[in-house]
Structure formats: structure tokens, C-alpha cells
Amino acid sequence: MKILFDFLPIALFFGMFKYAEGHKDWAAGLATDWLGFMVSGGVVGPAEAPVLLATVVVIVATLAQILWLKARGRKVDTMLWVSLALVTALGSATIYFHSESFIKWKPTVLYWVMGASLLVGELVFKKNGIKSLMGAQMSLPDAVWRKVNFSWVAFFAAMGCLNLWVAFNFPTSTWVNFKLFGGMGLMLVFVLAQAFFLNKHIKPDTTS
């Protein structure tokens, strides 16, 4: 359920982009009416309207996630705060400058921040981030936890690079498809691979 919650802003970004892409004149009019005061020149063209409207939607959706968690008295993950900061800063630049290049960097920066936090935690603070998250559910040798931690670092680094490659070498519509389906699909494949790896190394329960 949490993974669906985490992917909700991406799904809404995808939905708004695809709808606006199919109704560009309507999207341009709406974006000019609602965002004209925020954009350079005051007018949004049909070509740029879909990504600008989708950017507004993803900012609002990410903020709504945090407000919903706060209203229910739940802890807001640090990465969700980071995501809100990134999407607000890069999204605002995208809207003002009429340039999708800024928002295209958001997934990459977020992937690299997550990877860097795991790497710094392991090398500098001697704290394994993945073990902290999963250690209560399974018992593994420290050497295995390190391998798992570094594999996530490598995965996040690779995903950040892959996002940039798709974003700046293919049409924006292709990047939007990759952002939802490619990102989710690769994450699922990686998690399944991790599950098989962990299953081989789980220590047997000898307490019974």
C-alpha cells in the first residue's frame, strides 16, 4: 500500500500530462489563465502547457501527501520532505522559464540524494541504512548487509543516470512514460532480485 502512496504524485503527473497532451489548446488556455502571472512573458504555449500543468499537479500532490500524513499524526519520511523541496524548487523554475529541463532533473537528484545518504551513512557514520530499515524483520551477517546497502547505492546512482539519458535524448512524452512505468518496473525487478539474494543468506531461527 505504501508503494502506491509513494507513486501517487508520479501517477497524477502522468495522468495530467497525457490528458493535456491530447488537448493542447485547452491546456494552453488553462495554463495561461492560472499560471500566466508566474511565467516569464505571461503566456503559455500549447507545446509547453502539458508539462507545466503536470508540474503543478505533482507539487500539489506531494504537498497533499505531507498534509495527509500530518493530519493523521504519522511521521513524514525525510525523503518526502526532500522530494517536496526538489519538486517545488525545480517545478517553480520549470513554470517560470517555460522549460521542462528543470523538472526532468528532479528524479535524478532525488535518486542521487537517496544513494548518497546510504553511502555517507555507511562510510562516515558506520550506520547501514538498509539494515536500519529491515534489520528487525530478518537476521543477516553484517557483510551481507553491506553488500545490500552498496547495491542500493549503485541502483540509485544508475537510475539517476538513466533518467537523464531518457529525459534529454527522447521526446518528453517518452520520458513521462519512463518516469512512471520504467521507474516502477525497474524498482520492482531490483526489489525481487534483492529478495532472492536475501533469502539465500537469512540466518535460520534457532530460538524455537
UniProtKB/Swiss-Prot annotation:
The keyword Transmembrane helix applies. Plays a role in cell envelope biogenesis, maintenance of cell envelope integrity and membrane homeostasis. The chain crosses the membrane at residues 49-69, 78-98, 105-125, 150-170, 178-198. Its main location: membrane. Signal peptide: none annotated. The gene is yciB. It is found in: Cell inner membrane. Belongs to the YciB family. It is a multi-pass membrane protein. Keywords: Cell inner membrane, Cell membrane, Membrane, Transmembrane, Transmembrane helix. This is Inner membrane-spanning protein YciB. It holds the Pfam family IspA. It comes from Polaromonas naphthalenivorans (strain CJ2). InterPro entries: YciB.
